[in-house]
Each structure stands twice: as C-alpha cells, then as structure tokens.
C-alpha cells in the first residue's frame, strides 16, 4: 500500500496548476496551491500515508458529516422531518429550490441542510462548537484538533447568503434558533483544521459498521452508517456526485479547503488533500488520485 500511494502521487502531480484555490473565502486564498497528501486508514487500524498527509488544512464542508452524525446520535430518525436525503441538482448554496420547497432542504450536505442540522444540534448542546471539537478529537484520537478562528471569522464576515437561507427557513418555521448564533457555530465547524491522517481515522467508523476501532466506541448503528454513506454517495461532492461515482465509485465528502474523504465499506477510509479546486469546487488532483487508487485496488462499490 505504501508503495502504491507514493506511485499514485507521482502520477497525479503533473496535474498541479490546473485548478484554483478557493479565494472567495479570503482566509483560504493564501494556501500554497502545490500541496498534495493522502492517507488510508484500514479497519485493522493500520495507517498508510504519502505526500503532505500531515499538513493541516481547513476541512470546510467535510464537517457537515460530523454534524449529521451528531444529530443522528441524539435525535435519530426525527431529523428527517426537517430535511430530506435526496440530491438537489442545484448549487450548494441555492435559495431558489429552498423557497420552492417551502424551506425544507433537500439533503444535509447542501448549505441549507447543514444549517438545519446545526440548528438541531444547537438546541441539544450548551456549547455546540466545543461539543463538535471534542467529538472530532475522539473520532480521530488527536486531542490537539482545533478550529481556526481566523478562517471562521473570515467566513462569518461573508455570511450573507447563508444568513439568507437561514432566515428563509425560519419564515417557513424550519429554523428555530438564533440565526447569528447558529451561523457562528456552523463556521467554527467548517474551520476545523485537520490533516489527511486525522480525517482518514475520524471517518473510519463509517467503513466499519459504525464502530470506531481506536476508541472502541459504537458511534452509529451499522444501519445508520450505511445510510450516511448512501447520502455521501449521492450528495457528497456538490454538483459532481455523479462524476465522482463514475470515476471513483465510493461514498465521499469534499470541502472547498481541498480535502476529499472516501469510504470503502468493510475495508478502509481514505482522505486526500490538494487545495486546487476544479470548476465544481472539488479537489482536482485529489479526485484524480482517488480514481487511480480505487481502480488499482478495485475498490468501487459499483
């Protein structure tokens, strides 16, 4: 596996320079674009990594999976009364579909859906940001995980569209908390700084029927883990879930920080990171690396 990861990174490195770092979030725009890392965490507890796998980056929308898992953990099926689990077919921050469907987001991985999940968690936890941080620390076994306050503040200062979505949902009685408080929590979640190894380990439970190997915790039931994986497969890559399924063939979740996490059910979790994004907002080189890895080991679930 180690030789394979090194080989794959060498093969995709020539693609560096073809994408663009997410500069619409000012604090992310200064990230060095030529970085590339990958980590694989097996269900047996083994970790393999290559490249810049220990370099921290902003996980951004990957955090939406952690928020969803938290909500399922304390509220179960009740959360689906407030949002769906269908692909949206619209931009991740679209307001048009949200109004047409009367404030009920299509799924938890578009921004409106993630805000509803955050609203649900906000009502459950006294300190939602700390609760999320501690949850992620537990999942990856790294007590040093923190949220980058500069990134969170940068996103908060450019919150207008997310605030509009929240207030629109509130007008349909599908958003119950204080909008500004929920947005603060949401951006702190997105601003968590992790590396490929941290994220591969943190997502290991989704490859292992909901069981976290290194902590010994049953995070979700096997059925719930399967359900989360199914939503990742259909809605985890912005408007490129179909292309990711075609090329990589695994449940996945991406973020505009350049990270992509992929789940190989019953076998492993993988995280790849390269900050240059394609037109759909996903890591250009990261997707190419996952495509090669999945093909070489025949990991596609299809």
From Swiss-Prot:
It catalyses: L-glutamine + H2O = L-glutamate + NH4(+). Keywords: Hydrolase. It is an enzyme of class 3 (hydrolase). One of its GO terms (molecular function) is glutaminase activity. Gene3D superfamilies: DD-peptidase/beta-lactamase superfamily (3.40.710.10). Substrate binds at residues 61, 111, 155, 162, 186, 238, 256. Its EC number is 3.5.1.2. One of its GO terms (biological process) is glutamate biosynthetic process. InterPro entries: Beta-lactam/transpept-like, Glutaminase. Homotetramer. HAMAP family: Glutaminase. This is Glutaminase. The gene is glsA.
């Amino acid at each position: 596996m180690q030789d394979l990861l090194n080989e794959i990174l060498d093969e995709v490195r020539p693609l560096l320079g073809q994408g663009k770092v997410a500069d619409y979030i000012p604090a992310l725009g200064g990230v060095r674009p030529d970085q590339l890392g990958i980590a694989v965490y097996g269900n047996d507890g083994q970790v393999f990594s290559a490249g810049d796998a220990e370099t921290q980056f902003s996980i951004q929308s990957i955090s939406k999976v952690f928020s969803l898992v938290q909500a399922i953990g304390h509220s179960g099926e009740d959360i689906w009364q407030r949002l769906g689990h269908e692909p949206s077919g619209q931009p991740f921050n679209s307001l048009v579909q949200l109004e047409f469907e009367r404030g009920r987001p299509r799924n938890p991985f578009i921004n409106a859906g993630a805000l509803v999940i955050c609203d649900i968690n906000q009502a459950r936890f006294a300190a939602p940001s700390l609760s999320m941080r501690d949850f992620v620390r537990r999942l990856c076994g790294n007590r040093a995980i923190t949220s980058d306050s500069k990134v969170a503040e940068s996103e908060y200062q450019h919150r207008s569209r997310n605030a509009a979505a929240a207030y629109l949902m509130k007008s349909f009685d599908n958003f119950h908390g204080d909008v500004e408080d929920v947005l603060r929590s949401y951006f702190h979640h997105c601003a968590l700084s992790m590396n490929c190894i941290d994220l591969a380990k943190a997502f290991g439970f989704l490859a292992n029927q909901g069981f976290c190997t290194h902590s010994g915790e049953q995070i979700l039931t096997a059925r719930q883990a399967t359900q989360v994986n199914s939503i990742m497969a259909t809605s985890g890559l912005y408007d490129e879930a179909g292309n990711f399924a075609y090329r990589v063939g695994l449940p996945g979740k991406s973020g505009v920080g350049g990270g992509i996490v992929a789940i190989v059910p019953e076998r492993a979790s993988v995280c790849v990171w390269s900050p240059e994004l394609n037109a759909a907002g996903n890591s250009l080189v990261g997707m190419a690396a996952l495509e090669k890895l999945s093909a070489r080991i025949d990991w596609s679930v299809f």
